[in-house]
Structure formats: structure tokens, C-alpha cells
Amino acid sequence: MAYVPAPGYQPTYNPTLPYKRPIPGGLSVGMSIYIQGIAKDNMRRFHVNFAVGQDEGADIAFHFNPRFDGWDKVVFNTMQSGQWGKEEKKKSMPFQKGHHFELVFMVMSEHYKVVVNGTPFYEYGHRLPLQMVTHLQVDGDLELQSINFLGGQPAASQYPGTMTIPAYPSAGYNPPQMNSLPVMAGPPIFNPPVPYVGTLQGGLTARRTIIIKGYVLPTAKNLIINFKVGSTGDIAFHMNPRIGDCVVRNSYMNGSWGSEERKIPYNPFGAGQFFDLSIRCGTDRFKVFANGQHLFDFSHRFQAFQRVDMLEIKGDITLSYVQI
């Protein structure tokens, strides 16, 4: 079953290195780039480049370069006409060898804002117009799990915060037919606290997609995601991943739990790992994708699913991004 990304949300899972690909729609204020991966045990350095074109020797608007070399630091720079500019550096290393990480670049009007594992790390002022940037390059001593482009204007004013996600970018990308695209209603929330309760404005509708990105704590036992009717407490869809075991699905209606569903091809929730969930509401079922792979379907038991107006997330996790 093919994974259909939501509008404005462009993920690539398990890309190979070196990664050199166009930025969908080009770089613009308000865009965020999420990079999830693992720093290798023998890591010495890696880099992320925001490049002006795909050719060798192309200008690099922003060079991000963590270095484990006895003087652990992160170097920032710009290259124009084959010449590097003045280095900026921070003598602090937010990455740990052998550990998962989440690296976020937020494109602001005056600078790039770098966030590592949910903590703001650095701001790098634009030396080249960001509109010139066309490609993202990643290489070095790391393993990539996913790269996500969250696109467009208007700009987010701060981190955490919100920004509006527009429709699919057009340049360099041919989207599926419009009738196959999920509909996303609300702005994304960055780094919301756990437990999280969000309001589904207008209720749950067919073809609406919920995106949840987070991190399973190393000591985690489980987490819970509920699609609820606020006025009654009914739970149309209860999803309960149990770390190292199974993913339980159920519903709670009229004061009683229904029959559990547990069968899945694999459990994508591991202690100390990031996850990327896409939950799409259809006319007769929920479709759940984890890290771009179909995980399971859950048929509607609560037929008036349009009355579902709350999303509840709790458990042994941190959240980096929720789009409702």
C-alpha cells in the first residue's frame, strides 16, 4: 500500500549517502527541514549543505559541519566562487556517537535557526539570498533515517511555535492527483508538551491526515494516542504501542472497551528511537503509516467519526512535531 504524504510534507525515508537532492519548491521563509539519523560510533565529522545548484563546486549558502576531532565543535560557513568565507564556530557538540538525533533547520527571514533534539543550538545569518538555494546535501559519518521538508510561507516566528503549511510545492515534484491527497486543516505545533491535547477544528473528516513526530524515551514502556469525542469521552480510535511488544488498537464507547486488535507486521516503536506517524481518516477506516510504511488499518466502530474533535497523546515520549 503506497504511502501518500500530506500536502506540504515531503518525507524521504532511509536515504543513501551521499544525499544530494533538490529541495521541493526551493527554499523559502517558514520552511523547516527535519533530519533524523544516527551518529556512527566512529564519527569524526559530517556536513549538511544548502547548495546553489547541483554541480560540483556550486556555491554553498550554508555549510553545517559537526567535527569530533579532539576539539569537539560545529563549524558554520558559506562558499562563494570556490572560496570559503569567514568561519563561525560553536565549541559545543550536541551529537553523541552511537546515538539517534533529530536535526532541524528552520528558515527565517534573517537567518537559519538550528535546533538539535528539540533544543535551539545556533542561528546563522544569511550571506546569500535564500531564494538561490536549490539543493540539500548531506554526507559523512552518520546513518540517515529520514529527511522531511515542511514547506512554505508565512514564516514561523519562533521555536517552538506554529506556521502555516501550504499546498504541495510545484518545482521538481509531480504530486499525485488532487483527489488522492489528504487534507490537513490545522497549523503544525513544534515541540508540544506531553501529555498533549489538541482540538480538531471542524471535527474529524474523511481524508484528513494527522502527522505525529516524536522520540521514544530510552526507558519507555508505552504510549497512547486517542481520537476522542470531547463531549462524551468516547474514544473512536485508541492506539497503544507497547515498547518491545505490540501495538494495541481499540475503541471505548458508552463506557466500555471493545475488542482489542494486535496483529501488525512489525513494531516500529523502539526505546531510544524517533518515529514518524501518519494517521489518515477514511470513510470506513483509519490508515496508519509509520516511517513511511503501512502499519495497519482500523475500521471505524464509531460511525459518526465526524464528532471526534480531540487528539490526545501521552506516555513515555517527547514530541517534536504534531500536525492536526
Curated annotation (Swiss-Prot):
Highly expressed in full-length form in small and large intestine and stomach but was not detected in other tissues including lung, liver, kidney and spleen. The keyword GTP-binding does not apply. GO terms for cellular component: extracellular space. The modification Phosphoserine is found at S259. GO terms for molecular function: carbohydrate binding; galactoside binding. Contains two homologous but distinct carbohydrate-binding domains. Residues 19-150, 196-324 form the Galectin domain. Galectin that binds lactose and a related range of sugars. This is Galectin-4. Monomer. It comes from the Eukaryota. It comes from Rattus norvegicus. PANTHER family: GALECTIN, GALECTIN-4. One of its GO terms (biological process) is defense response to bacterium. InterPro entries: ConA-like_dom_sf (IPR013320), Galectin-like (IPR044156), Galectin_CRD (IPR001079). Gene3D superfamilies: 2.60.120.200. The lineage of its organism: Eukaryota, Metazoa, Chordata, Craniata, Vertebrata. A beta-D-galactoside binds at W257, G258, S259, E260, E261, R262, K263.
